[in-house]
Structures are given as structure tokens and as C-alpha cells.
Amino acid sequence: MITPMLAALVLASSSCPIAAQDLPLHASAHPTTSLDAAFHAWLTAINSGNRAEIQAFYRQHADDPNPLFALEQAEDSCGFAVDHFKAKTSTSMEVLLRQKCLPGLQRLKLAVANAGDSKLKTLDLRPMPLPDNGAIQATRLVADRLAQRGEFAGAIIVEREGKRLFAASWGEVRPGSGRAITLDTPMLLASSGKMFTAVSILQLVAAGKVELDAPIGRYLTEYPNAEMAKVTIRQLLNHRGGAGDIGILGRDEGANRARVRTLADMIEINGGRPPEFPPGSKTEYSNYGFILLGAVIERVSGMAYADYVQAHIFAPAGMAHSGFPDRDHLDEVPLGFTRYFGEQEAKVPNTDTLPWRGSAAGGGVASANDVARFFGTLPTGKLLPPELFELATMAGDTPWYGLGFVVNSGPEASWGHGGTAYGMDVAVHHYATIDTTFICLGANDMVCNRLIFAWFLRTFPPGDQDD
């Protein structure tokens, strides 16, 4: 199965559509079955490059009113023409498609439950794998076109076995400033910063100062809610503590945002409530849980959270372009632009929704080169003992999360952590089976999710590939 989160950037019309009258090779202009008709209708909609036409097809034939992945593939590929049919019956077909703008092929599988049905039970489109240089070339082409349209400013690095396969950056720190974003430009990390919190806690575990299965009340002795104080460090690290969100990141949470400067301020806003569910009973992603972990770091170490991370992670890993600047000191950080995840058409700066500074839940800054240094240092034992690094990056009670790291097992085994907020997007993952790290830092909505998919889908074969 594909594991990175599907990109969710809402697209406008394609910049390079194939004309709707272009017919697929080896296919009749007069469909003879309902499946033929569905295929012709799909190809016409995709090749139109028109968002409304594509949505109408998916709504009618697949009960999917907002097929974001298909919209992105239509735009990234500039449309399709048939290369050849691999298989075709009255109820199913598999066809390989050429792409106008990108190297390689895409595979489309269509199926209906019964001959004559118009509703599809299977509609699966995905790029076919390419050699390293092909996957990287495709990713760069997608990034180039996004940047040309003002939809991507940021940096990408791909490394294998410690050697750099690709590195590039796009855009300016401020539009029109002439200050180009580079691989050393610090960029907002959003929730990717949770990895720093996890490593910090595990360092304190290694030092014998924190126990994973101890309740947070052992360290935060004056915590205001007795039930929340019983939640363990481990449950917060793997999002099974029921701690909930922090109430400062939404567009409508500006009043809370204005009040918050420190972790203690966040606890003042959120500390009175109990867990949202019995701790350990289920998994629910929680920003507030990592705020509590940050408070434990401060209490046990005697250092402010940002100072601890600087001394114990950034400095040892050689991360000279990383930190936790406040909102008044972001001149060197690229300005993010957002459409509030499709809530509006116009892009606006994300400054109104930025918290005062990054925290233990995320939001610090690092350059692409620094993130590469962090990923390169983690497995060496310099930041964590090997056994704790292994524990952090393997699935536990939560199949997709370790201790502060998003993980996956199987042939696409990986560890890392993405981050998404208004006007910022991060995708940073290490794929263990091919010893490859993909790093994308962006200053736009959901753009790095889209770019890691462009690379990932062309790097790993489909799980059901038979040749």
C-alpha cells in the first residue's frame, strides 16, 4: 500500500491539456461496451484539463466528488494517450498511458461489477516505476511547473546511502526581493519538529531522568487536571493519550494565538480538560500531547525547550541554520502563501495564522541541508542510543507511528515526519529498504505532499504489479 498522505492541493485548469478530440491508440472512437464508454469519458475528462469536467466524471462513475489525486495527475502529466492495453475483458481493463509532460508511463485499471454497469468498482491510476534519474527528473519537472505558477517555493534533497542524488531550490525568501531560497535557507517545519521533541525525551530516557511508562504527573507535579496527569510519556509520544489539540492554529483561534508565548501559556489554555478518550484505547493525532512532552523536557532538564534542542540536537548534528525564531524575527525565513486548503481562491501570506514561535508540537525552522544532517546523524548513535532510535522508528500500538516518528513497514519501510499548516508543507522520510532520504520543505499549502508522491510513486512498484 502507498503510505505517504495524498496531496490535497485544489487545482485549477491544466496548463498544457491534450485536446479533447485526441483519441487513444488502439481504441475505437465508438465504444462497444459500458467499460469502453467509461474509459473514453475518463480520458476525455482528464485530457480536458478542466477541474469541473474531471470532478463530474468521478462523481458519476466513482462516487468521488473531489478526486484530488486525479486532478493533480491530470495537471502534472499534461494529459494522456494510450501506449497499449495490457488486458481487457467485458468487465475490466488495464491500460498503460503515455504522459505529455513527464517521462515514463502511468497505469490505469478500470473494472465494473457486471458487464453493462456504468458505475466503476475499480478506478486506479498511478505512475509506473522509473530508474532513479527518471523518478528525480519527473519530480523536478513537477516542481519546476509548480514554481513557475507561484505554487512552490522551497527546496528538495534526495540522498541514497549518504550520497546526494539530487538537490535544488526554487523561489525567493520574499517575492520580488531577489533573495533566492537556497539549501541553507531556514524554512518553517510545522509538525516535522515533533521529531526534535521525541529525540529530546528519549535522550532524557537514556540518561535515566525520564521513564517512558511514567505518568506526566510525576514530572509536572502541579498539572491542573488529575486525569490528564495520569497519561504516560509513551502514550503522548505515540498519540494514544487523548490530549487533543492546542487551540491556537486555526483561522478562528487568533485570540488564543495572541495570548501564547510559552509552553506554560499553552498549558494555561488547555490544562483544565481531561483526556478525550481513555488513554491507550485508540490513536488520535495530538499537538497538545507534544506540548506536554515539551513541558516535561523543560522541567527535567532545567532548560527552555528551544535551548535544550539547540544544545542537544542542533549543535551536535551541525545544524547551523535551525532554530526557533519568534514571529518578529522571520526576515530570513521564506514567506508562506496559503489558500487555506482550498477555502478561498486567492493566495495570501500566512502571517496572520503563525504562532508567536515554534514549540514542542512543531513550527521551528531548519534548512534542507540541516534536515539532511539530522537524518544522517540520527542512526549513528550520536543523538540517541541505537536501541532507542530503533524503538522510536518502529511501529508500536499505532501501526503508522512510532515514538514521535511516522513509520511504515514492509517493502516501503520508512521513518520520518511530515508537517502541514497554512502556507507551509514539509515531507521528510527515510526509506530503509533502499537507504534513501527524501526531503522537501515548502512555503505553500500541501505542495511537498504532492512532490514526494511524484517521486515515491515512480520509485516503488505498485503492490499488485505482476511484471
Regions found by a protein language model. Give the residues of each.
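Short, conserved catalytic-motif segment at the N-terminal edge
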Residues: 133-189, 209-211
